[in-house]
Amino acid sequence: MKKYYLKLLCFVLPIGLLAQNTVQDTIMIGLSIPEIIFAEDKDEGERLLSPNRIERIDAIDIFQDAPTSSADILQKSGAVAVQMSQSGGGSPIIRGFEANRVLLVVDGVRLNNAIYRSGHLQNSISISPLMLENVDIVFGPSSVKYGSDALGGVVHYHTKSPQSGQAWKANLLQRYSSVNNGVNLYYDHSWSKGKWRFLQGINLNRFGNLKMGEQRYHGYTDWGKEAHIVDDNEQLRTAYDQVDFIQKIRLDAREYLSFKMNLQVSSTTNLNRFDQLNDFSNGQPKFEEWYYGPQKRLLLGLGTEHQKKNFFYDSFNNTISYQQLEESRNSQKYNADLIQRTEDVFVFANTADFIKKWDYNTLNYGVDLQHNIVHSRATEGYGTRYADGGSDMTTISVYSQYKAPLSKRINFSAGARYSKVQLKGRFNETENLGLPFKSIQLNNDALTASLGLKWEMGKGWESTITASTGFRSPNVDDVTKVFQKSGKLTVPNENLSPEFSKNIELTINKSIGESYLSATYYYTLLENAIVKQAFTLNGQDSLWYDGDYLPLYANTNSQDAFLFGYNAKAYIHLNKQWSSTHTISYTYGKDESADALLGHIPPLYGKSQIDWSKNNYRLGLFVFYNAWKKAEDYSPNGSDNLDEATTDGTPSWWTLNLSCSVNLSDKLMAQLNVENILDVHYKTFSSGISAPGRNVILSLKTEF
C-alpha cells in the first residue's frame, strides 16, 4: 500500500481548489468561550495532523473587538504582538519571528510571496476583518503542512462562504471610530438556488488622522510629538482609505463533488510612512514625502472538492489560485526629486490535498506548486528595488502527515515535507552598483519534519509534546534587493541558502468543568539564519546612492540563535453569566554568532478580560498590558527601531477597555466599545507611530 501512496505523491496532477468550511453568520450574543484548538481536533478544512497549538478567533469575537484591520484582530486577541510603522499597517510577531518568517494564508492560499521582506510588513491589512468567518493562529514551525516561511507560525484567515438552503440573506454594518474619525461601511448578501450558492461582499473604510493618548504616565514629555508632523496629539498625514470586495460561487454538482470560485480584491490609497516622515537630518526633517502607493491585491481561486471514498483517498481538495499585487515606495527629500519604485508581483499556485482514513488512522498527503514573477521599475535615472530585468521564484513540494493511536489515551502524529526552490534574478543596469554578475540563480532544497505525542492523562489533564522543524528559502527580497535604510545600503548577494528552525515544545492542559488552563513552553534553534553584514563589491565598501554616500551591507547566512519562551491561557467559567479570560506570552532570544540579543523579540505581554452575558446583553471589561523593553535589551542590528523609542527603550504600558452590545431585535445589534479609556500614551514594541488614544467606537449591525 505504501508504494501506491508514494506513486500517487509523485504523479498526481492537481485539478481544482481547496474546499472551505461554511459556518452560518448570525446575530447573537452569548458567552464566547475562547478556543485553544489542537490540530487533530480541528475541522478538516485545515488539514493539520501535527499537534501544534492553534488558537481560533471566531466571527463573533472579531465583531465584538471592533478591529480596524485584520492585523488588529491579532493584537486584540492578546496572543500575538503587532508592530506598527504607520496607521495603515500591522506586522504580526509570533514567538520572536516576524515578517517573512511568519506565514500568512487566506482560504488555503499563501499570501507570502517572493518580495516579503524581513523587517516589518503591512500586507495583512489587505483582508477585511468583516469578511472573516474565523482566524487560526498556528504557533511554532509549521513547514510540514505549509512549506517555506512558517518558522514562527502561521496566521490563517478564513473568509465567509455561501450557505445552502438560503433564498436570500444580507448583512449591513456601520461603524464609527472617534480616535481617527473613521467610518466603516460593510455589506454582504448570499443566496442559494438548487445546486448553486453565491456570496458577495464589499467593505468601504475611511480613516482620518490618528490621535495618540494624552496621559504620559511613562514620564517622557515629548516622546512621539515631533512638531512638524504632530498637532497637539493628532498624528498628521496618517489618514487613508481602503476598499475590499469578495465574491464566492459554489456548485454542488454531485453529492460528493463541488466546484468553487473565490474572488478577492483589495486596494488602499497612499499610506504615509509616519516613521520615515518623523526622521531628522542636520536638524531638519529628512523627507518631504515618504509613502507607500496604493497597495493592491487580487486573488482568484478555482477549485474542486471530491469526497467519494476510493482506494487512494476519502476526500480530495485542490486549489488553483492566481494573485496579482502591486506596491510602491515613494520618497522625496527636501529640495530633491520624488523617487518612485514600483513592484508588480504575479503568483500562480496549485495545491492538491488528500486524506485517507482507515480504522483509527489518518493519512494526509499532497503536492504544492508555487510560481512567483516579479517586475520592478523606478523613476528614470534611479535604481530599482529588485533586479531590473525581472525575477522569478518557483517552489514545488510534496508532503505527508500521519496520525494514529498508540493506546486509548496516547495519540501519535508524524509528518515530513520535501521542497525544491529555484530563484532567478536578471540585472540590466549594473554600472552604478558595480555588480560582478548580470544574473543570480539559486537552487535550494529542504526537508522538514514533525513528531508529536498527545497523552490524555485523565481527570481533565492532557499533555502534548511536539518536535518540529521549519525552513525559509531565500526569496527575491533577500537575494536581489537594493535598499537604503538607517544610513546603510543593502546590495545583492548570490550566495544564500535556506534558514532553518528546530523546535521542541511541551503543552499542559487542565480542564475543570467548563473552565480550562493551558500552558506551553518552547525552545527553538535558528540555524543558518539570514542577517545583514558589512559587505564589499569589487573591493569597495561604500557607494553613492540616492544622494548619499553609504556603507555597503548584504544578506548572509551568518547567524545561529536560540529562542525560548512560554504562552499561557486561562478561561474561568464562573457561572452562566460571568467568565474571565487571561493570556500571557514571553520570549527570549539570543544571537549566538554575535553574542548579542536577537531582534523581533517583544517584551512580556498579555490580556485579562472579564465578561458578563445575559439574554440580549453582553458586557466585557479587559486590560492589555506590556512590560518594559530596555534599550540594552534591543538587538544591535537595528531591526527593532530603537530610534523610535525613548533613550531608555520602550516603556511599559497598560490600557483599560470596555465592550458592550445588545440585540435590539432578531435582526438588529448595537455595540459600544471604548478603547484606552484612560487615554494613555504609548507605543507598541518596535513601532514608529504612537498607539491610538481614547477611542469610542459605535457599531450597528443589521441582518435582513
Regions inferred by a protein language model and the residue ranges of each:
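Short, acidic, small-residue-rich periplasmic hinge/interaction motif at the N-terminus
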Residues: 21-63, 99
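Flexible loop and strand-edge segments within Gram-negative outer membrane beta-barrel domains
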Residues: 23, 236-238, 242, 255-315, ...
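Gram-negative outer-membrane beta-barrel transporters
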Residues: 407-408, 412, 421, 522-525, ...
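Surface-exposed extracellular loop regions of Gram-negative outer-membrane beta-barrel proteins
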Residues: 269, 276, 280, 324-326, ...
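Transmembrane beta-barrel wall of Gram-negative outer-membrane proteins
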Residues: 180-207, 218-272, 296, 406, ...
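N-terminal periplasmic accessory domains that precede
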Residues: 35, 70-73, 90-93, 104-105, ...
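Short acidic/polar hinge/loop motifs at secondary-structure boundaries
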Residues: 111-139
